[in-house]
């Protein structure tokens, strides 16, 4: 007869009619009973031959991705001119007085951020844009290129000009200028004042691209500037438009312009196939002999192009420079030939664009280190796209980077901190990750880009193969013409116009601000926002500012007070160069929505959309059918988030955790499903802990337990000896049920930690319910008043300790000790006794 649900509830002491707790509870620690119940509920059955279920409602296995949907009308989001001020520490000090050591350390971490992986794997440019949408290859290519171009224009990416130089838009930081031979970028006064220099012969010859750039430049990670002779410099104004290598090189740097000095670079024919001859850019743009460009100092800069004749290779016939413009002079091969499209415009614009500033970078190969693709911005906003960058190579394999850990407030700390009668609002930081600047030395490791449209299309169409010897010759120019490509490009022409030409060229971009796809970024963002909030909290001691990643919340006593705080904080953040999105500021009233929780003066509960998800999950959950452990991972993730709000908490999910660990399928019995279902249908808020004096103490030995409740002492014995942790847990439960006290003193670290998942399953579930909302204070064994009763000695009465309990707010220091501050700020309090901070994260 399988265990009925009612009987199971009674067994777990969840119903009122249970006998005395001192008799009932120790039974739940019995191994034999736990085994029988597990068998009854199919909790640990050996593997079964029934096929596993791989999908439950929306939950599929962890690694089976849902099929993404491409939207041809995606809008590329606009990025404001984000420039975090370099003197951020000075500005904060003007605002709040001297910063604490902690705040300074955190702000220095992101000014600039540095990234040096152990080794970097370089991928061919063809892998730059992932063929994520096979039906919309060309459309996705151009949308992605447009997104990358937008990021470059917004100063978020560097563009690789040559293997040792890059250009960017926006405002430069001093560490970018320092790379220019230790000097600032040339000011307008120095235009043309310097003679032309030959490059010094001391420059080491180029070594082949190794798996790791770092080793060679260990001494100076920024590319050995100290040993370099001055680079060839023409009369070109402030931002160097060209970097030329004066000694003839057999490998031409990717994407470099023809050299101004007049030397003809000798290309090897091999490089034609591997670096795609469109690297000779403006040579093809022959109908415009010079292109004017505003330099950053406001002077027009002229770039003289070499006539195409000088760029011919000696070893083969004419090499065509620009794949796109070649179609202009060729005969149409069909009705869908690209030459029809190219002839629509006389002026297709330049082959490449250059940034306002040029800097030196460590040697960067013409490769990428991660692929990119587009997805919906979020489930609620499918009109805009979001760029996904896959730098997962740094988290995999033997050379993987172990990312720094950082403190995330646990649920109880968060509740202690934010559960109050304040009015709340949350600020939206636009493109938060793109605020934090990266040092240029990280550029060779974080490269994205594309190989240009011609190679991209050729790669994907199996019938046209790129042969080394015929690349760029007429016979395979029209190989890429097809009806599908022609129709796609005609439609895209309406959107992008003459930019189609620019986007069809290869490009390599490195990150100038931290990208989302690297494990370092969340850490840096968390450090940055927590330091800023710490500064705000000290400037307005009567208010509360708190952040988790890019989610910043402000709380104040009244709505009027909150509005004035909002104005002051917004102005402060804008003065630092942090961009806020005022349209997305949310005013929450007295219950704050934050990190998936609703937090009010009554405590914390999960947000409504999460409870709806849980209900839906239980509706779809099959009974008596083995479910794939990967699907169980998804289910447990959802249920685990809401577990602290249920009667039995995490211990109720232990059977699921066990099967995931064993990588076995899990079968829900009707009783276990009904039990979980009932658990999650009634959620109880997690309340904030209150400070107080501990009056109740519990202690146990393997054979007996003892309590000290005020001046009263109690003791009892167990039927059979129990493991010490189990005995201590039982004693704590008895203390709670006898006294009703929410504050109990114990000398057992496991009970203090409130992790009841390692106890016998039934006992863990019952204890979680009995001890819900209880706070523990650590009392050393020698001073524990319950120590004597637990050893059977009632006569001796040790005096009760005065043990105060102060709830902790995790690592969020609300009472940061300020360095000497202006006198108008009130004195701050500092609680730092290890004995008082007794709370351990659940």
Swiss-Prot record:
Q: Where is this site: Priming of reverse-transcription by covalently linking the first nucleotide of the (-)DNA?
A: 63
Q: Give details on activation and inhibition.
A: Activated by host HSP70 and HSP40 in vitro to be able to bind the epsilon loop of the pgRNA. Because deletion of the RNase H region renders the protein partly chaperone-independent, the chaperones may be needed indirectly to relieve occlusion of the RNA-binding site by this domain. Inhibited by several reverse-transcriptase inhibitors: Lamivudine, Adefovir and Entecavir.
Ranges for the region named Disordered are 184-238
* UniProt key word Nucleotide-binding: no
Q: Where is this region: Terminal protein domain (TP)?
A: 1-177
Polar residues composition-biased segments: 212-228
Q: Which Pfam families match?
A: DNA_pol_viral_C (PF00336), DNA_pol_viral_N (PF00242), RVT_1 (PF00078)
**Key word Nucleus present:** no
Question: Which reaction equation describes what this protein catalyses?
Answer: DNA(n) + a 2'-deoxyribonucleoside 5'-triphosphate = DNA(n+1) + diphosphate; Endonucleolytic cleavage to 5'-phosphomonoester
- Keywords, in A-Z order: DNA replication, DNA-binding, DNA-directed DNA polymerase, Endonuclease, Host-virus interaction, Hydrolase, Inhibition of host innate immune response by virus, Inhibition of host RLR pathway by virus, Magnesium, Metal-binding, Multifunctional enzyme, Nuclease, Nucleotidyltransferase, RNA-directed DNA polymerase, Transferase, Viral immunoevasion
Q: Where does Mg(2+) bind?
A: 428, 550-551
Q: What is its EC number?
A: 2.7.7.7, 2.7.7.49, 3.1.26.4
Q: Where is this region: Spacer?
A: 178-345
Q: Per its UniProt record, what PROSITE patterns does this chain match?
A: RT_POL
Q: Describe the task this protein carries out.
A: Multifunctional enzyme that converts the viral RNA genome into dsDNA in viral cytoplasmic capsids. This enzyme displays a DNA polymerase activity that can copy either DNA or RNA templates, and a ribonuclease H (RNase H) activity that cleaves the RNA strand of RNA-DNA heteroduplexes in a partially processive 3'- to 5'-endonucleasic mode. Neo-synthesized pregenomic RNA (pgRNA) are encapsidated together with the P protein, and reverse-transcribed inside the nucleocapsid.
Annotated gene: P
Q: What is this protein called?
A: Protein P
């Amino acid at each position: 007869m399988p265990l009925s649900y009612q009987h199971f509830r009674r067994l777990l002491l969840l119903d009122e009619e249970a006998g005395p707790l001192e008799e009932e509870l120790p039974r739940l620690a019995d191994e034999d009973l736990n085994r029988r119940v597990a068998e009854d509920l199919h909790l640990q059955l050996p593997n079964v031959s029934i096929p596993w279920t791989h999908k439950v409602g929306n939950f599929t296995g962890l690694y089976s991705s849902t099929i993404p949907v491409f939207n041809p009308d995606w809008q590329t989001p606009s990025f404001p001119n984000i420039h975090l001020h370099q003197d951020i520490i000075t500005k904060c000090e003007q605002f709040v007085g001297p910063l604490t050591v902690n705040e300074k350390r955190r702000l220095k971490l992101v000014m600039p951020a540095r990234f040096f992986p152990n080794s970097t794997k370089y991928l061919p440019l063809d892998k730059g844009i992932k063929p994520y949408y096979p039906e919309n290859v060309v459309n996705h290519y151009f949308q992605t290129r447009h997104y990358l171009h937008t990021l470059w224009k917004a100063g978020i990416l560097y563009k690789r000009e040559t293997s040792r130089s890059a250009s960017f838009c926006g405002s430069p930081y001093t560490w970018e200028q320092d790379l220019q031979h230790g000097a600032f970028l040339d000011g307008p006064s120095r235009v043309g004042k310097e003679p032309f220099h030959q490059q010094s012969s001391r420059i080491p010859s180029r070594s082949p691209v190794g798996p790791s750039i770092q080793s060679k430049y260990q001494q100076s990670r920024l590319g050995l500037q100290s040993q370099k002779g001055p680079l060839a410099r023409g009369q070109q104004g402030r931002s160097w438009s060209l970097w030329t290598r004066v000694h003839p090189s057999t490998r031409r740097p990717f994407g470099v312009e023809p050299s101004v000095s007049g030397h003809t670079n000798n290309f090897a024919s091999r490089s034609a196939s591997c670096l795609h001859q469109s690297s000779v850019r403006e040579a093809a743009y022959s109908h415009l002999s010079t292109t004017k460009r505003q330099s950053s100092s406001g002077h027009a800069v002229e770039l003289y192009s070499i006539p195409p004749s000088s760029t011919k290779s000696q070893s083969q016939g004419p090499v065509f420079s620009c794949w796109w413009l070649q179609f202009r002079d060729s005969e149409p091969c069909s009705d869908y030939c690209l030459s029809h499209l190219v002839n629509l415009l006389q002026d297709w614009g330049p082959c490449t664009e250059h940034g306002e500033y040029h800097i030196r970078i460590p040697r960067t190969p013409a490769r990428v280190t991660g692929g990119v693709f587009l997805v919906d911005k979020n489930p609620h906003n499918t009109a805009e796209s979001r760029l996904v960058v896959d730098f997962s190579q740094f988290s995999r394999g033997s050379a993987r980077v172990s990312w720094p850990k950082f403190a995330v407030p646990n649920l109880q700390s968060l509740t202690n901190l934010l559960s109050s009668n304040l009015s709340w609002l949350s600020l939206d930081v636009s493109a938060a990750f793109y605020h934090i600047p990266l040092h240029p030395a990280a550029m060779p490791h974080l490269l994205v880009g594309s190989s240009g449209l011609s190679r991209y299309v050729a790669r994907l169409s199996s019938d046209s193969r790129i042969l080394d010897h015929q690349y760029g010759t007429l016979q395979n120019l029209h190989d890429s013409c097809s009806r599908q490509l022609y129709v796609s490009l005609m439609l895209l022409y309406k959107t992008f116009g003459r930019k189609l030409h620019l986007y069809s060229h290869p490009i390599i971009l490195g990150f100038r601000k931290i990208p989302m796809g690297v494990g370092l970024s969340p850490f840096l963002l968390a450090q940055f926002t927590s330091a800023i909030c710490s500064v705000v909290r000290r400037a307005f001691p009567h208010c509360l500012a708190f952040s988790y990643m890019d989610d910043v919340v402000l709380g104040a006593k009244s709505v009027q007070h909150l509005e004035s705080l909002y104005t002051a904080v917004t102005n402060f953040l804008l003065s630092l160069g942090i961009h806020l999105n005022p349209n997305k500021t949310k005013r929450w009233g007295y219950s704050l929505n934050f990190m998936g929780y609703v937090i009010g003066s009554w405590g914390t509960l999960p947000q409504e959309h999460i409870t709806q998800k849980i209900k839906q999950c239980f509706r779809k959950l099959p009974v008596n059918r083995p479910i794939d452990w990967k699907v169980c991972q998804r289910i447990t993730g959802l249920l685990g988030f809401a577990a602290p709000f249920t009667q039995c908490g995490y211990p109720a999910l232990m059977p699921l955790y066990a099967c995931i660990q064993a990588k076995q399928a899990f079968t829900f019995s009707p009783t276990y499903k009904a039990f979980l279902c009932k658990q999650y249908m009634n959620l109880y808020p997690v309340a904030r802990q209150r400070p107080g004096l501990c009056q109740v103490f519990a202690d146990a030995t393997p054979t007996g337990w003892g309590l000290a409740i005020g001046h009263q002492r109690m003791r009892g014995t167990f039927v059979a000896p129990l493991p010490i942790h189990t005995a201590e847990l039982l004693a704590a439960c008895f203390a709670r049920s006898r006294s009703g006290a929410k504050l109990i003193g114990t000398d057992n670290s496991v009970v203090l930690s409130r992790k009841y998942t390692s106890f016998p399953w039934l006992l863990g579930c019952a204890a979680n319910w009995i001890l819900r909302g209880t706070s523990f204070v650590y009392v050393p064994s020698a001073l524990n008043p319950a120590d004597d009763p637990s050893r059977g000695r009632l006569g001796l009465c040790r005096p009760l300790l005065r043990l105060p309990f102060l709830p902790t707010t995790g690592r969020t220091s609300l009472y940061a000790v300020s360095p000497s501050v202006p006198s108008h700020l009130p004195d701050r309090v500092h609680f730092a006794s290890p004995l008082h901070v007794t709370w351990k994260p659940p």
